[in-house]
Amino acid sequence: MDDKLEVMFAMQKELNRRIGQDTDTMTDEERVEWVLNYARALGQELAELVDSVPWKWWAKYQQFDQQNVKVEVVDIFHFLISLAQAVGLSADEVFEAYMKKNKVNFARQDAGYVVKDEADNKGI
């Protein structure tokens, strides 16, 4: 069975190339531009996710649209993968960094997370 994260990264690379963005050939200047573009797009998708859940305490007519929430989460993955690719992260590198950061997060929780030590992130 293919690695699902690898498949998602490959599919996103193909979609981005079809749109006209190839992270393999970007200059550093283009990378900065696309990091900002993807970060803004992520912010917009997060806002759309928020609007998909009933958060307006003053409105009684709201309903939870779970299907739309799922779609927004997937949209977030699209831009998050694009962002990872724009900064040169592969699926394997994301996985490895996630595993290391998860270990740091657990250690912080075990210690009561009373102090945030940025040195914890140096090895990630």
Per-region residue spans from a language model:
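Flexible "arm" and connector segments at domain edges
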Residues: M1-I124
